[in-house]
From Swiss-Prot:
Superkingdom in the source lineage: Eukaryota
Record organism: Drosophila melanogaster (Fruit fly)
UniProt keywords, alphabetically: Cytoplasm, Molybdenum cofactor biosynthesis, Nucleotide-binding, Phosphoprotein
Family: Belongs to the MoaD family. MOCS2A subfamily.
GO aspect biological process, one term: Mo-molybdopterin cofactor biosynthetic process
Job description of the protein: Acts as a sulfur carrier required for molybdopterin biosynthesis. Component of the molybdopterin synthase complex that catalyzes the conversion of precursor Z into molybdopterin by mediating the incorporation of 2 sulfur atoms into precursor Z to generate a dithiolene group. In the complex, serves as sulfur donor by being thiocarboxylated (-COSH) at its C-terminus by MOCS3. After interaction with Mocs2B, the sulfur is then transferred to precursor Z to form molybdopterin. Involved during biosynthesis of the molybdenum cofactor.
Additional notes on this entry: This protein is produced by a bicistronic gene which also produces the large subunit (Mocs2B).
HAMAP family per the UniProt record, alphabetical: MOCS2A
Record keyword Endoplasmic reticulum present: no
Name of this chain's protein: Molybdopterin synthase sulfur carrier subunit
Residues with PTM Glycyl adenylate: 90
Keyword Phosphoprotein belongs to the record: yes
């Protein structure tokens, strides 16, 4: 990801299928301090091999769901980002 401005380290948490595909429960990534949710999602999908579930992922920034992928996200050092696929079960 090319960032023209300042960047910060963000903790990424993976759940369910995203954890399986990323092959890790957590990671740290460097992201711009301001980015759209779509740009962020595209970067994470590419970096962690989540293409097969991209269209079904939910993102949460510091435990708040990101409802609109056109929203701009403002990150601070050490923020948390959760990648949550839809859960299934019975």
């Amino acid at each position: 990801m090319n960032a023209d401005g300042p960047v910060v380290n963000v903790h990424v948490l993976f759940f369910a299928k995203s954890r399986e595909l990323a092959n890790t429960p957590r990671s740290t990534v460097e992201v711009p301090t301001e980015i759209t949710a779509t740009e962020l999602l595209d970067h994470l999908v590419s970096k962690f091999g989540l293409t097969s579930i991209r269209d079904n992922l939910i993102l949460a920034h510091n435990e708040s769901y990101i409802d609109n992928l056109s929203d701009r996200i403002l990150f601070k050092e050490g923020d948390e980002l959760a990648i949550i696929p839809p859960l299934s079960g019975g």
